[in-house]
Amino acid sequence: MQYLAAYALVALSGKTPSKADVQAVLKAAGVAVDASRVDAVFQEVEGKSFDALVAEGRTKLVGSGSAAPAGAVSTAGAGAGAVAEAKKEEPEEEEADDDMGFGLFD
């Protein structure tokens, strides 16, 4: 992911990304650069414009993003009783710690 992000940073700067540019970005971020991984990124994006890569990525995010809220709703409904019980217990703890023995504003 770091390698693709470095590629994107170079592309967003207005330059056509080169392997040297991507390696420079990675080194600036403190990443130990693996030349074979840089080569793999460039093989995957070969012949594609950056805009096409972004569009392809968005379709994948939409596909996986729509499933997440449905799962979150079902788990939130199942644990609602536990959340209510936890909220009931919290005020007791807060009341015991409010003064902490100082009594500055009595």
Curated annotation (Swiss-Prot):
InterPro entries in alphabetical order: P1/P2_N_sf, Ribosomal_P1/P2, Ribosomal_P1/P2_euk, Ribosomal_P2
Signal peptide (from-to): none
Keyword Phosphoprotein annotated: yes
UniProt cross-references to Gene3D superfamilies, sorted A to Z: 1.10.10.1410
Domain of life: Eukaryota
The keyword Phosphoprotein belongs to this UniProt entry's keyword annotation: yes
Cellular-component GO terms for this entry: cytosolic large ribosomal subunit
CDD domains associated with the record: Ribosomal_P2
Residues covered by region (Disordered): 79-106
Pfam families per record: Ribosomal_60s (PF00428)
Gene Ontology molecular functions: structural constituent of ribosome
One BP annotation, GO: cytoplasmic translational elongation
UniProtKB keywords: Phosphoprotein, Ribonucleoprotein, Ribosomal protein
Post-translational modification comment from the UniProt entry: Phosphorylated.
Biased segments, Acidic residues type: 91-100
Function summary: Plays an important role in the elongation step of protein synthesis.
Assembly notes: P1 and P2 exist as dimers at the large ribosomal subunit.
Membership in a protein family: Belongs to the eukaryotic ribosomal protein P1/P2 family.
Name of the featured protein: Large ribosomal subunit protein P2
Gene this chain is encoded by: LIP
